[in-house]
Each structure stands twice: as structure tokens, then as C-alpha cells.
Amino acid sequence: MKKLTTIFIVFTLALLFVGNSTSANNGSVVEQNGQLSIQNGQLVNEHGDPVQLKGMSSHGLQWYGQFVNYDSIKWLRDDWGITVFRAAMYTSSGGYIEDPSVKEKVKEAVEAAIDLGIYVIIDWHILSDNDPNIYKEEAKEFFDEMSALYGDYPNVIYEIANEPNGHNVRWDSHIKPYAEEVIPVIRANDPNNIVIVGTATWSQDVHEAADNQLDDPNVMYAFHFYAGTHGQQLRNQVDYALSRGAAIFVSEWGTSAATGDGGVFLDEAQVWIDFMDERNLSWANWSLTHKDESSAALMPGANPTGGWTAAELSPSGAFVREKIRESASIPPSDPTPPSDPDPGEPDPTPPSDPGEYPAWDPNQIYTNEIVYHNGQLWQAKWWTQNQEPGANQYGPWEPLGDAPPSEPSDPPPPSEPEPDPGEPDPGEPDPGEPDPTPPSDPGEYPAWDPTQIYTNEIVYHNGQLWQAKWWTQNQEPGYPYGPWEPLN
């Protein structure tokens, strides 16, 4: 596409954080901030002022690429207030290595972001191919092409290794040497834009990278977490890395457990959001998809081009939208008029004994209040307006009355695992070697193999049969909250 001329506006009052106004008065976020760089471990704009980007990550473009288009990204900018979008291009699992045409969807996302004046992350999404060196030559070719096409645009951020993982894949031995070959390819075309490098153990071990940093002034280190699995220990690792002067970008996080499903864990997510805000850490939430998992931002049937109603947002999506809007100084509002049946007027019949609680009012904004509606008390789980208690099983209201709710407040897990892996659990300890002792009587079932991919299979390990509950590789049976269910 024809290159755009980036207009840089000099402010007399420095911005402390990236806002997100796209009005004619303020210009786009890229017009406001221009070329990003790192100073003293902090992401800053062209004026040297600290910047905090907030936005969304796609799911795998080979599976859910229909949600990545100009209209959906524009809606995320205008309605949610995002300042960054991450295009997650899986390398394996049906991604770029098997189907190079998926890079066309990356280009579509990048060019939309440039037109819309937001930042964009080009994500080389390694996952089941746990060692980034497996496809190092392909990575060099890909980033040579991307940096040649888009290196003149300050919008672009390169993420060269999503989640290195596996007990042998460490920063010093595998990840840093890989980065030292890939980054120079980018720098030959693009000397200035930010490069994000993944860290060991599914981009959790930022402390290792902080102790042996790359020799590039504009490198950041990826940190990923899932609110239902990860807590204070990982926050301590981030603080250690920051204390060593390492620049951290939370290029992926979820409200769910580390599997991408389970939850949502909104209280824990809020702790993490506060943590990131206090440290001015930029972030992208996983993920823009309608997949049947709790980390998905959209409900099944959501419009791929944006304009999402309240009914089309999942609990995670509604929560993340509001968190981004808060920092973007966008007044709270419903996404669009809901597609659910009109709730009509508030319950005109005074409850027989509602105590101190008022009747639900569709015109009222609620965040944590308790209301009375249809003979029952309800409490808002997050920000809501004009969403009737009980009208949506995945909605913002939790029943408090004596009668049990007709549907669970969280989406039920799928009866069968999805064929695509989603994000595997990065919270497991290293599984070590497979059980070297053959089972005395495993019957027809093979011994667990850490190199094998499992989705629903039964294996024998440590004298016991185990069945995979979802996609897994290199995660040893027997760890709590993991992907394996004991069968005997």
C-alpha cells in the first residue's frame, strides 16, 4: 500500500501515559507519540515521555483470521480505545510454516493499524514448536520481508518468539542466540522500531533475560500470564527484571487459567492490571475470537467486523473492554444497543421483602451493586448498563437469592477438546524426562512421551493411567491443575 506520511505533533504538556483519543483535536495515538524507544528500561515516545500501550491480541490467524480486518480493528480503536493490536501468526499447528499465505492476514492487520494510527505487533507465534531455533531460517526470511515493507512506519513492533518452552529451552543456550541472529536481519531494514523477544517457560522467566540482556537499545522482553494460574511469584520475577533495567512488554495475558479456559478470574485479573498500571507496563489481552473458551473476548456468533453488542461480548471481553476504556478516558457505555429482547421497564411491582436493595433499572450504571429483579437479588460482577439480570447466562449478573441459578455463571467447558491447541498451560513446572520404567501391565495404552502431542488420548505414567483433557505436549501427568486426568 502507499506509504503514509506520519505527522508528529509536539505537545507543550508531556503525556504521562498514552491516552487513546482519536479526535481531530488530538490526532491518532501514533501522531501523538511517534517513534517509540527504550530509555532506562521504560517504553517512551519520541518526546521521551513514558508510554503505556493497551490492546488486544488476535487468536491464531489460521483459525480465527476472520476477526482480523480493518473494520474490527477500527471498532476496537473507536469503541474499546485500544492503542495496540497484536497479529498472532502461529508458525506450526497449521500456521505459516505449513501455509505461508497466512502472512497476508498479518499484512492486512499491519496496514489497517497504520491507516488507523495505532501501534501493531507482528507476532512470530511459536508454541508447539517450543524451540525458536527450529524455524530460525524461516523467521529470518519472514522478518526481512516485514521490516523491508513496514520498517519506515513507527507503528510497527516485532515480536520474534512468542513463547519459548520446554525444560531444555533456556535463555542463555537457545533464545538469546536465536535473537542475536534474527534482530540484525530486522535492523538492516529498520534500525529503530521496538523488538520484543520471548523468554523461557512460555515467556515467564524474564528474570533470566534480565541477567543477560541483548545488546540492542530498543529491545523489550516478553512476559505472559493468565490470571487464574499465575500470581505473586511471577510478579516478583517481573519486579526483579525491572530492577535490572530490563524493559518488559506483557504481549499476552488472559483472564482465564493458563489453558485459555476456566474462569474467568476477574478479581485476580484486576490485581494484575493494577500491577501493570503501577509499573507502566504495556499489554495485549488474549484473545479476539469467538472460540468456546473463557479467555475469548467474543461470544459464539459475534460479528467478525466489529459493532459488537453487549450480548456479543464474553465476560472476559466485557471486562477487558472496560479496563481499556478507563485508561483511554472514554466514558462508560454499552458497546451498542443489545440484541437481546428489550428488557422493557424496570420491575414495577415492589418486592415483597427486598430489604434495602432497589429494583433493577435499565438506565442505571452498575459495577458491584445489588439489585432486586423478578423476585430475586442480583449482584453486578462488572460494569453493566441495560443488561437485564437473568437474560443472559454469561452476563454480568450473579444471582444471590435462595433459588439456584438456572445456568452456571461461567461458561461450561466444552464436552470435547478443540482441535486447535489454543494457548497451552505455561504454568506447569518442567516435566523432566519420561518415565523410563515400562509399566508392568498398561494394557493397550502407551507410556507417556513428552515429545508427543495429546488431545484426548490415554497414557500410562508412574503406575497410573491418565487421559488428556485438552491439547498438551511436554506437560507431565500428575501436576495439579494440569491437562491430565487420572483414570485409576
UniProtKB/Swiss-Prot annotation:
Source species, domain of life: Bacteria
CDD domains: ChiC_BD (cd12215)
Keywords, in A-Z order: Carbohydrate metabolism, Cellulose degradation, Glycosidase, Hydrolase, Polysaccharide degradation
Keyword field contains ATP-binding: no
Catalyzed reactions per annotation: Endohydrolysis of (1->4)-beta-D-glucosidic linkages in cellulose, lichenin and cereal beta-D-glucans
Signal peptide interval: none
A single GO molecular function term of this UniProt record: cellulase activity
SMART domains from the UniProt entry: ChtBD3
Xref: InterPro entries: CBM5/12, CBM_sf_5/12, Glyco_hydro_5, Glyco_hydro_5_CS, Glycoside_hydrolase_SF
Pfam families: Cellulase
GO CC terms in record: extracellular region
Biased composition (Pro residues): 332-353, 405-416
EC number: 3.2.1.4
Residues bound to substrate: 59, 63-64, 90, 125, 226, 258-259, 286, 291-293
Active site: 163 (proton donor), 252 (nucleophile)
Acidic residues: bias regions: 417-433
BP GO terms, sorted: cellulose catabolic process
Family (UniProt): Belongs to the glycosyl hydrolase 5 (cellulase A) family.
Protein name: Endoglucanase A
Originating species: Evansella cellulosilytica (strain ATCC 21833 / DSM 2522 / FERM P-1141 / JCM 9156 / N-4) (Bacillus cellulosilyticus)
